[in-house]
Regions:
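Small-molecule kinase domains that catalyze NTP-dependent phosphoryl transfer to phosphate-bearing small molecules
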Residues: 71-74, 94-164
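Zinc-dependent deaminase catalytic domain
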Residues: 2-11, 15-33, 42-44, 93, ...
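Generic beta-sheet signal
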Residues: 1-5, 58-66, 271
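Nucleotidyltransferase catalytic core that binds NTPs
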Residues: 4, 48-54, 68, 73-83, ...
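Hydrophobic/aromatic ligand-binding patch that stacks against planar heteroaromatic rings
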Residues: 76-77, 140-142, 286, 310
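Short, well-ordered alpha-helix to beta-strand connector turns
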Residues: 60-61, 81-82, 143-147, 153, ...
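ATP-dependent small-molecule kinase phosphotransfer cores
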Residues: 19, 23-69, 73
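ATP-dependent NMP and nucleoside kinases share a basic, alpha-helical "lid"
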Residues: 54-106
Length: 354
């Protein structure tokens, strides 16, 4: 794995790089122009192309880089399927305090904050020509391309490390999805086609790891779409699970089951239904009837317990799977993260309201 860390000024990129080195045996790799190369005992190269070639030859090893400044560099690294771009950020006041500490400055000069904000914004938004005439890429553009975003408001390294452990950064699923992740992502893609104005649900029916059919929720064909006013129940804002009998929309699971047909699901092989939302009781009955052997879902729904009881009685395995690529940093150690943010906002309030 080759991890590229990008982020705002004093967000903690190098601290996270050190965590990867110490906890996961990564090697710091960078350009010879990186001023912190010696500090990390880094492998240094004269160009991004040389780094790309080296990591390609040694792709089974783990490397981390924090020095990505041009679009050309980033594009070279992103061509490789073992590269993961991670964006790091922290609240402004947190980064300012770190900046003061790094430069051994006292927080008693109002001009210091202005200097920091100017320096931070220059890194975040400013494009300029570098020494090799390649256009630099601002941090905000790099962050848009990141596969993972990390918020780092922590006061000490120990808490940050706990949070990073909970994020499971080095999970191979982030580079090449498992079958569960692959099909769940397909169900999320199918959900984008939903025309129900209440909820986006997508479903994938699979047998022996081969897609049989797909489905999403919305009105039957030749009828006005729900999001065009076609379903009175949905458009009147009925609560979850209420008046489902008057809903004119087909559920994603129903669409997928109708498309597949019972004959394609029965017989040798293992039929699995992937849905980004746990099936309702009405869909659960149909799933049992057609012979699906396993149901995998990502998001909970209001009827989960009743659905689970029916599947258990029918001998159908029900389990939850949320791909790491669909998880945000808040789904790591959320309590630890929330406490750190609360502490810093309290410090900010005390600072400006003495």
């Amino acid at each position: 794995m080759f991890i590229g860390l990008t982020g705002t000024l004093c967000s903690g990129k190098h601290t996270i790089a050190r965590y990867l080195i110490e906890a996961h045996q990564f090697q710091y790799i960078t350009l010879t122009t990186d001023p912190r190369a010696k500090e990390f005992n880094a492998l240094t190269f004269d160009s991004a192309k040389e780094i790309q070639e080296f990591t390609t030859k040694n792709w089974r090893s783990n490397y981390v880089i924090c020095h990505i400044s041009t679009a050309n560099e980033l594009n070279l690294y992103r061509k490789r399927p073992f590269f993961l771009l991670v964006a790091v950020d922290a609240p402004l006041i947190v980064r300012y305090n770190r900046w003061l500490s790094r430069n051994s400055l006292e927080n008693n000069n109002p001009a210091m904050l202005a200097n920091f904000v100017f320096e931070s914004d220059a890194l975040m938004y400013h494009s300029k020509k570098s020494y090799d005439s390649d256009m630099t890429i601002p941090v905000y553009k790099q962050a848009k391309l990141a596969e993972l975003s990390i918020l780092n408001p922590f006061d000490n390294v120990e808490e940050l490390h706990k949070h990073l452990d909970s994020l499971d950064i080095t999970n191979p699923d982030r580079l090449r999805p498992s079958w569960d992740t692959y099909f769940m992502l397909l169900s999320e893609l199918a959900a984008r086609r939903a025309n129900c104005m209440k909820r986006r649900v997508g479903c994938i029916l699979v047998k022996n790891n081969r897609v049989i059919s797909t489905g999403y929720n919305g009105k039957p064909r030749n009828l006005k779409n729900c999001n065009d006013g076609g379903c009175e129940r949905c458009n009147e804002g009925a609560k979850c699970g209420v008046d489902l009998g008057t809903c004119l929309c087909l559920h994603a699971e129903e669409n997928a089951l109708l498309e597949a047909g019972r004959e394609r699901l029965e017989g040798p092989g293992h039929a699995i239904l992937y849905c980004n939302t746990c099936p309702c009781l009405g869909c659960a009955k149909k799933i049992v009837q057609v012979g699906v052997q396993e149901v995998v879902y990502s998001q909970a729904y209001g009827m989960d317990e009743k659905t689970a009881e029916m599947f258990c009685e029918a001998g159908i395995q029900l389990r939850q799977h949320t791909p790491v690529s669909l998880s945000s940093e808040l789904e790591g150690d959320s309590k630890l993260l929330s406490n750190a943010l609360i502490n810093h906002f309290q410090m900010t309030t005390d600072l400006f309201n003495p």
